Each structure stands twice: as C-alpha cells, then as structure tokens.
Amino acid sequence: MAGHSQFKNIMHRKGRQDAVRSKMFSKLAREITVAAKAGLPDPAMNPRLRLAIQNAKAQSMPKDNIERAVKKAAGGDAETYEEVRYEGYGPAGVAVIVEALTDNRNRTASNVRSIFTKAGGALGETGSVSFSFDRVGEITYKLSVGDADTVMEAAIEAGADDVETDEEGHTITCGFEDIGEVSKALEGALGEAETVKAVWKPQNTVPVDEEKAQSLMKLIDNLEDDDDVQNVYSNFEVSEEVLAKLSA
C-alpha cells in the first residue's frame, strides 16, 4: 500500500478525522462550488458536481452545507478559484504531488514552498515528479457491499483495472478516461460508491524507515492543513512493522 494511504489509515485510527472535520467540509464545499460554477448547478447534468456531492455525502457532510455550496456558485458571488498542481520532493527523496484550489496563486505557492522547505524537502517545477505517477480513476466501497471475490467480479465486468481489499474497504482503480463508465457499471452491480475520484497513483514506491515515515507524515499533515490544498499524493511505503509502531 502506498504511503499516503497508510498515513490516512493511521490518522483515521488516531481519531484525527474528527479534529479536522470542519476543515474537510470547507475543502469539500470549495470543490462543490467550483464544480457548480464550471458547469450547470444541476448534478444530473454536471458529472463533476455529481461526484463532488457524492464524495461530500460519503464524509457525512450535512445536506444544508452541500446546498449552500451549490447556491453560492449559482448566486454569482463565489470567489474565482484556479486549479493548481505543485510537485516536489520530501525527505528521503520521496515524490509528492499537491493539488489545490486557490483564489491567490502567490499565497498558495508561498505556503506550499515553505511547508516543503521546513520538512527538509523542496518544491520543484510542474512535471518534475508527476511522470512517475499514473493518473487513474479510484472508486471506493465499504466492506459491507460484499466480499473481495464479489467486488472483484463486479469490477472486472465493469472494465476496471485493479481491486484492493483491506480492513478499510474496497478500492477499485480504472483508466482515468473510464471513470464515468466504470463507476456507472459498478453502481448497477454494487450500489452507489463511497467515493469516485481521479487520483495520482505511483508507478513505484520508495521504502522508508520509521524516522523518515514520521517526517513524511508531518509534511503531508501540514500540507493538508492548508486551506487551499485539496489533495496530496506521495510514493513512499512503510513496512508492516513500522506501520504498527506508527499506529500505536
């Protein structure tokens, strides 16, 4: 499992999700507003908005918050946000991709650069690390939808490329351009997914020890704490032994 997925599981077990719920809702609302402003405010006619709302619901975002975010775009008074991608290296030469939605590129770039520098890493040029990742679709389901074999069969039938099942749930990957078609087929077989999104998947992972893993987790934590940052991806991996220590 790639390092960032492991990191998220650790933070979930430590209860950090509750501590950052308000910030998470703010990020989800921003994506909903941007999606609604970029197309029609009707999720039935706007695939990006439909996915944004679906992902917000998966995180138990209140219905009122979702509706307010959509209306904000329809009202025409929403800030203008740009989608920006930053790429760099963290401790141990680990590649990191940061996706942001910002109304001030200079502010966000300065903040992201500062976080990388303080962690002993460096912000690079766009394209400096993304070549070592693949842009893919990721569809997740809770374990309750079925066992690994059932989900694997549905995924193959839907045209997905891979399925991983662990204690957190089922993660299905597919080609970036196939997200809509595959997720629709899976919905017919398994019901509505928990999340459907495009992600950066590392082609290879870099093993790190406990010390470096802690530094990388802190880097990712600080990046995700920035209001403008929506997603962070990395290519580090830790052993089960180190994972157990970090989860303790």
From Swiss-Prot:
GO cellular component terms listed in the entry, alphabetical order: cytosol
SUPFAM superfamilies recorded: YebC-like
Protein name: Probable transcriptional regulatory protein Smed_2641
Single GO MF annotation: DNA binding
A Pfam family matched in the record: Transcrip_reg
Gene Ontology biological process terms from the UniProt entry: regulation of DNA-templated transcription
Compartments, as annotated in UniProt: Cytoplasm
Keyword Transcription regulation part of the UniProt annotation: yes
Source organism (scientific name): Sinorhizobium medicae (strain WSM419) (Ensifer medicae)
Protein family: Belongs to the TACO1 family.
Keywords: Cytoplasm, DNA-binding, Transcription, Transcription regulation
InterPro entries, per database record: Integrase-like_N, TACO1_YebC-like_2nd/3rd_dom, TACO1_YebC_N, Transcrip_reg_TACO1-like, Transcrip_reg_TACO1-like_dom3, YebC-like
